[in-house]
Amino acid sequence: MDKEELKRRAAARALEEVRGGMKLGLGTGSTAKHFVELLGERVRLGLEIIGVPTSEVTRADAERCGIRLTSLDEIDRLDITIDGADEVDHHLDLIKGGGGALLREKIVAAASDRMIVIADESKLVDTLGRFPLPIEVIPFGLGATRRALQNAFTAAGCDGELKLRPGKDGHAFVTDGGHWILDAQLGRIPDAPRLAQLLSVIPGVVEHGLFVGMASTVVLAGADGIRTIERA
């Protein structure tokens, strides 16, 4: 069974949590796209929900699928956000942002009563860090921000290289918010909460891809079926 089928099965399991009248956060990335497509099928059959997209890509996908959309300017809270992850550990802490939407993803997740993460089983790791950690930054003063980031890595017991994410045109990748992304290739993050705290206070850092204590449920699809992990 290929990974796309596993992602779709995880998305289908998360869809079972959706009820009519819910307000949903719609994640970004290949796994979240499967959820949006399956949700669209339910909407066409009469399910009434409203969604808040976490990126312009997801907005376009949701509109194509006939999903009614709104924004966090119009509603206060969401019932559930369903999103993917680049890595998830056994504490249900995550690395997200491989698709470049980490800022909006975190805003939407924080405004939700529950966050359900959907993924194939390869995303479950003992320690975060194998997947490069995305850090969204302001272009101004990039050199100073880089130096501050390296100091934060050292303080958190990490070591690694920072690379500016390229876009398709060969220039720097630009997020929906107009920022750049530095990908930190750390290999291993021994204390994700500590690193998250250190990154959050650096001037020039808009947001980082460590989602600590945010996921309520993780749905993992593997060759042996679906595994659901709930936050203790």
Swiss-Prot record:
Keyword Cell wall biogenesis/degradation: no
CDD domains attached to this UniProt entry: RPI_A
EC number, UniProt record: 5.3.1.6
Gene Ontology BP terms: pentose-phosphate shunt, non-oxidative branch
Pfam families the record matches: Rib_5-P_isom_A
The entry's keywords: Isomerase
Binding site for substrate: 28-31, 83-86, 96-99, 123
Pathway(s) the chain acts in: Carbohydrate degradation; pentose phosphate pathway; D-ribose 5-phosphate from D-ribulose 5-phosphate (non-oxidative stage): step 1/1
Enzyme kind, highest EC tier: isomerase
PANTHER family attached to this UniProt entry: RIBOSE-5-PHOSPHATE ISOMERASE 3, CHLOROPLASTIC-RELATED
HAMAP family: Rib_5P_isom_A
Record-stated family: Belongs to the ribose 5-phosphate isomerase family.
Role this protein plays: Catalyzes the reversible conversion of ribose-5-phosphate to ribulose 5-phosphate.
Name the record gives this protein: Ribose-5-phosphate isomerase A
Species whose genome carries this gene: Rhodopseudomonas palustris (strain TIE-1)
Record lineage: Bacteria, Pseudomonadati, Pseudomonadota, Alphaproteobacteria, Hyphomicrobiales
